[in-house]
Protein backbone atom coordinates (compact mmCIF):
# COMPACT_ATOMS: atom_id res chain seq x y z
CA UNK A 1 0.00 0.00 0.00
CA UNK A 2 1.44 3.40 -0.96
CA UNK A 3 1.70 6.33 1.41
CA UNK A 4 -1.07 8.13 -0.46
CA UNK A 5 -3.38 5.17 -0.04
CA UNK A 6 -2.46 4.93 3.62
CA UNK A 7 -3.26 8.62 4.12
CA UNK A 8 -6.60 8.20 2.38
CA UNK A 9 -7.43 5.20 4.53
CA UNK A 10 -6.56 7.03 7.71
CA UNK A 11 -8.50 10.13 6.69
CA UNK A 12 -11.56 8.10 5.76
CA UNK A 13 -11.38 6.32 9.09
CA UNK A 14 -11.23 9.58 11.06
CA UNK A 15 -14.01 11.09 8.94
CA UNK A 16 -16.23 8.13 9.80
CA UNK A 17 -15.76 8.71 13.51
CA UNK A 18 -16.37 12.42 13.04
CA UNK A 19 -19.74 11.59 11.50
CA UNK A 20 -20.53 9.36 14.49
CA UNK A 21 -19.61 12.14 16.87
CA UNK A 22 -21.76 14.65 14.99
CA UNK A 23 -24.74 12.34 15.13
CA UNK A 24 -24.25 11.67 18.80
CA UNK A 25 -23.96 15.35 19.80
CA UNK A 26 -26.91 16.82 17.93
CA UNK A 27 -29.75 18.95 19.25
CA UNK A 28 -31.82 16.00 20.50
CA UNK A 29 -32.43 15.88 24.23
CA UNK A 30 -31.00 12.55 25.28
CA UNK A 31 -31.83 10.88 28.55
CA UNK A 32 -28.91 10.29 30.98
CA UNK A 33 -29.00 6.57 30.24
CA UNK A 34 -28.79 7.17 26.52
CA UNK A 35 -25.86 9.55 26.95
CA UNK A 36 -24.13 6.79 28.89
CA UNK A 37 -24.86 4.44 25.99
CA UNK A 38 -23.29 6.86 23.52
CA UNK A 39 -20.29 7.27 25.77
CA UNK A 40 -19.90 3.50 25.89
CA UNK A 41 -20.01 2.89 22.14
CA UNK A 42 -17.73 5.87 21.46
CA UNK A 43 -15.17 4.82 24.11
CA UNK A 44 -11.77 4.27 22.50
CA UNK A 45 -8.60 3.79 24.57
CA UNK A 46 -5.50 5.63 23.38
CA UNK A 47 -2.93 3.32 21.85
CA UNK A 48 0.54 4.34 20.73
CA UNK A 49 1.87 2.95 17.48
CA UNK A 50 5.08 0.96 17.51
CA UNK A 51 7.58 -0.04 14.85
CA UNK A 52 5.49 -2.98 13.72
CA UNK A 53 2.21 -2.40 11.94
CA UNK A 54 0.98 -5.76 13.14
CA UNK A 55 2.14 -5.58 16.74
CA UNK A 56 -0.63 -3.42 18.14
CA UNK A 57 -2.70 -5.14 20.78
CA UNK A 58 -5.89 -3.73 22.30
CA UNK A 59 -5.81 -2.74 25.93
CA UNK A 60 -7.77 -4.87 28.38
CA UNK A 61 -11.44 -3.99 28.22
CA UNK A 62 -14.02 -4.69 30.88
CA UNK A 63 -16.89 -7.00 29.98
CA UNK A 64 -20.22 -5.19 29.82
CA UNK A 65 -23.73 -6.53 30.25
CA UNK A 66 -24.89 -5.94 26.69
CA UNK A 67 -28.56 -6.24 27.61
CA UNK A 68 -28.12 -3.32 29.99
CA UNK A 69 -26.53 -1.28 27.23
CA UNK A 70 -29.31 -2.10 24.79
CA UNK A 71 -31.90 -1.36 27.47
CA UNK A 72 -30.47 2.12 27.92
CA UNK A 73 -30.75 2.77 24.22
CA UNK A 74 -34.25 1.33 24.11
CA UNK A 75 -35.33 3.55 26.98
CA UNK A 76 -34.32 6.55 24.92
CA UNK A 77 -36.50 5.47 22.02
CA UNK A 78 -39.45 4.05 23.86
CA UNK A 79 -39.58 6.00 27.11
CA UNK A 80 -38.36 9.40 26.00
CA UNK A 81 -39.95 12.06 23.85
CA UNK A 82 -41.19 9.59 21.25
CA UNK A 83 -43.13 7.55 23.78
CA UNK A 84 -44.58 10.68 25.39
CA UNK A 85 -45.95 11.82 22.06
CA UNK A 86 -47.51 8.40 21.36
CA UNK A 87 -48.94 7.37 24.71
CA UNK A 88 -52.22 9.24 24.20
CA UNK A 89 -52.74 8.27 20.56
CA UNK A 90 -55.89 6.30 19.77
CA UNK A 91 -55.75 2.81 18.29
CA UNK A 92 -56.82 4.21 14.93
CA UNK A 93 -53.65 6.32 14.79
CA UNK A 94 -51.33 3.91 16.55
CA UNK A 95 -51.71 1.13 14.01
CA UNK A 96 -50.60 3.43 11.21
CA UNK A 97 -46.80 3.57 11.41
CA UNK A 98 -46.77 4.05 7.64
CA UNK A 99 -48.06 7.58 8.17
CA UNK A 100 -44.94 8.40 10.15
CA UNK A 101 -42.81 6.98 7.37
CA UNK A 102 -44.48 9.24 4.83
CA UNK A 103 -43.53 12.41 6.72
CA UNK A 104 -39.83 11.68 6.58
CA UNK A 105 -39.41 13.20 3.14
CA UNK A 106 -36.85 12.13 0.56
CA UNK A 107 -35.27 8.74 0.98
CA UNK A 108 -38.11 7.21 2.97
CA UNK A 109 -39.68 3.92 1.99
CA UNK A 110 -42.73 4.28 -0.24
CA UNK A 111 -46.13 3.26 1.09
CA UNK A 112 -47.08 -0.23 -0.06
CA UNK A 113 -50.58 -1.43 -0.91
CA UNK A 114 -50.89 -3.81 2.05
CA UNK A 115 -49.90 -0.96 4.38
CA UNK A 116 -52.51 1.32 2.81
CA UNK A 117 -55.24 -1.32 3.12
CA UNK A 118 -54.37 -2.01 6.75
CA UNK A 119 -54.40 1.72 7.44
CA UNK A 120 -57.78 2.12 5.72
CA UNK A 121 -59.31 -0.66 7.82
CA UNK A 122 -58.68 1.45 10.92
CA UNK A 123 -59.96 4.64 9.32
CA UNK A 124 -63.71 5.14 10.08
CA UNK A 125 -64.04 7.29 6.97
CA UNK A 126 -63.10 4.28 4.82
CA UNK A 127 -65.66 1.92 6.35
CA UNK A 128 -67.86 2.28 3.28
CA UNK A 129 -65.02 0.93 1.10
CA UNK A 130 -63.25 -1.73 3.16
CA UNK A 131 -64.19 -3.60 6.35
CA UNK A 132 -62.90 -6.28 8.68
CA UNK A 133 -64.52 -9.71 8.42
CA UNK A 134 -62.37 -11.26 11.16
CA UNK A 135 -59.95 -8.77 12.64
CA UNK A 136 -58.07 -11.28 14.79
CA UNK A 137 -57.29 -13.44 11.76
CA UNK A 138 -56.58 -10.49 9.48
CA UNK A 139 -59.51 -11.21 7.13
CA UNK A 140 -61.01 -8.18 5.38
CA UNK A 141 -63.43 -7.47 2.55
CA UNK A 142 -63.90 -4.73 -0.02
CA UNK A 143 -67.36 -3.18 -0.21
CA UNK A 144 -68.55 -3.94 -3.73
CA UNK A 145 -70.21 -0.63 -4.55
CA UNK A 146 -67.23 1.44 -3.37
CA UNK A 147 -64.27 -0.72 -4.34
CA UNK A 148 -63.45 1.59 -7.27
CA UNK A 149 -63.43 4.56 -4.92
CA UNK A 150 -60.90 2.82 -2.69
CA UNK A 151 -58.71 2.01 -5.69
CA UNK A 152 -58.91 5.61 -6.90
CA UNK A 153 -57.87 6.92 -3.48
CA UNK A 154 -54.98 4.47 -3.45
CA UNK A 155 -53.82 5.78 -6.81
CA UNK A 156 -53.93 9.37 -5.56
CA UNK A 157 -52.04 8.38 -2.42
CA UNK A 158 -49.31 6.89 -4.60
CA UNK A 159 -49.19 10.04 -6.68
CA UNK A 160 -50.32 8.36 -9.91
CA UNK A 161 -51.39 10.66 -12.70
CA UNK A 162 -53.78 8.11 -14.17
CA UNK A 163 -56.83 6.96 -12.25
CA UNK A 164 -56.26 3.71 -10.41
CA UNK A 165 -58.91 1.05 -11.00
CA UNK A 166 -59.91 -1.88 -8.83
CA UNK A 167 -58.78 -4.23 -11.59
CA UNK A 168 -55.23 -2.87 -11.39
CA UNK A 169 -55.29 -2.96 -7.61
CA UNK A 170 -56.54 -6.56 -7.65
CA UNK A 171 -53.61 -7.46 -9.89
CA UNK A 172 -51.25 -6.14 -7.22
CA UNK A 173 -53.13 -8.18 -4.62
CA UNK A 174 -52.58 -11.32 -6.70
CA UNK A 175 -48.86 -10.58 -6.63
CA UNK A 176 -49.08 -10.43 -2.84
CA UNK A 177 -50.74 -13.84 -3.02
CA UNK A 178 -47.64 -15.27 -4.69
CA UNK A 179 -45.42 -13.89 -1.94
CA UNK A 180 -47.87 -14.93 0.78
CA UNK A 181 -48.31 -11.44 2.25
CA UNK A 182 -52.02 -11.28 1.34
CA UNK A 183 -54.05 -14.30 0.23
CA UNK A 184 -57.45 -14.51 -1.47
CA UNK A 185 -60.24 -16.08 0.57
CA UNK A 186 -62.95 -18.17 -1.12
CA UNK A 187 -65.44 -15.42 -0.70
CA UNK A 188 -66.21 -12.49 -2.96
CA UNK A 189 -63.79 -9.54 -2.56
CA UNK A 190 -62.32 -11.08 0.59
CA UNK A 191 -58.64 -11.34 1.47
CA UNK A 192 -56.44 -12.17 4.44
CA UNK A 193 -53.21 -10.62 5.72
CA UNK A 194 -50.46 -13.07 6.57
CA UNK A 195 -49.49 -13.49 10.22
CA UNK A 196 -46.12 -11.86 9.50
CA UNK A 197 -47.77 -8.78 8.01
CA UNK A 198 -50.19 -8.48 10.93
CA UNK A 199 -47.29 -8.63 13.35
CA UNK A 200 -45.32 -6.09 11.35
CA UNK A 201 -48.19 -3.60 11.32
CA UNK A 202 -49.34 -4.17 14.90
CA UNK A 203 -48.90 -1.55 17.66
CA UNK A 204 -46.84 -4.00 19.72
CA UNK A 205 -44.35 -4.30 16.87
CA UNK A 206 -44.20 -0.53 16.51
CA UNK A 207 -43.52 0.14 20.19
CA UNK A 208 -42.29 -3.19 21.60
CA UNK A 209 -38.88 -3.45 23.21
CA UNK A 210 -38.51 -7.19 22.78
CA UNK A 211 -38.19 -6.93 19.01
CA UNK A 212 -35.53 -4.27 19.47
CA UNK A 213 -33.64 -6.60 21.80
CA UNK A 214 -33.93 -9.64 19.55
CA UNK A 215 -32.36 -7.82 16.61
CA UNK A 216 -29.32 -6.86 18.68
CA UNK A 217 -28.71 -9.71 21.13
CA UNK A 218 -29.00 -13.45 20.62
CA UNK A 219 -30.75 -15.41 23.43
CA UNK A 220 -27.50 -17.02 24.58
CA UNK A 221 -25.47 -13.83 24.27
CA UNK A 222 -25.91 -12.28 27.72
CA UNK A 223 -22.55 -10.55 27.77
CA UNK A 224 -20.47 -9.07 25.01
CA UNK A 225 -16.92 -7.78 25.33
CA UNK A 226 -15.94 -4.70 23.38
CA UNK A 227 -12.41 -6.02 22.85
CA UNK A 228 -13.00 -7.03 19.25
CA UNK A 229 -14.39 -3.64 18.31
CA UNK A 230 -11.59 -1.82 20.06
CA UNK A 231 -9.01 -4.12 18.49
CA UNK A 232 -10.18 -3.19 15.01
CA UNK A 233 -10.17 0.47 15.88
CA UNK A 234 -6.80 0.41 17.66
CA UNK A 235 -5.17 -1.48 14.82
CA UNK A 236 -6.20 1.03 12.17
CA UNK A 237 -5.80 4.07 14.42
CA UNK A 238 -2.28 3.19 15.56
CA UNK A 239 -1.10 2.12 12.11
CA UNK A 240 -2.38 5.29 10.56
CA UNK A 241 -0.62 7.58 13.03
CA UNK A 242 2.57 5.54 12.91
CA UNK A 243 2.68 5.69 9.14
CA UNK A 244 2.08 9.42 9.23
CA UNK A 245 5.35 9.80 11.16
CA UNK A 246 7.37 7.87 8.57
CA UNK A 247 8.97 9.63 5.68
CA UNK A 248 7.36 8.68 2.40
Curated annotation (Swiss-Prot):
Keywords from the named record: DNA-binding, Nucleus, Transcription, Transcription regulation
The organism's place on the tree of life at top rank: Eukaryota
DNA-binding region: 111-194
Species, as recorded: Homo sapiens
Protein name from the UniProt record: Transcription factor Spi-C
A GO MF term: RNA polymerase II cis-regulatory region sequence-specific DNA binding
Lineage: Eukaryota, Metazoa, Chordata, Craniata, Vertebrata
Tissue: Preferentially detected in fetal and adult spleen, lymph nodes and at lower levels in bone marrow and fetal liver.
Disulfide bonds: none
Amino acid sequence: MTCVEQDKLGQAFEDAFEVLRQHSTGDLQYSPDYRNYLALINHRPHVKGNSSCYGVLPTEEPVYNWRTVINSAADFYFEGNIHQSLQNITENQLVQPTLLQQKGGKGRKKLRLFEYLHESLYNPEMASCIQWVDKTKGIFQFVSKNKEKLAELWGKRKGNRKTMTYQKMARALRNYGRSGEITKIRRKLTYQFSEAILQRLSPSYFLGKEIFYSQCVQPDQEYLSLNNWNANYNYTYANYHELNHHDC
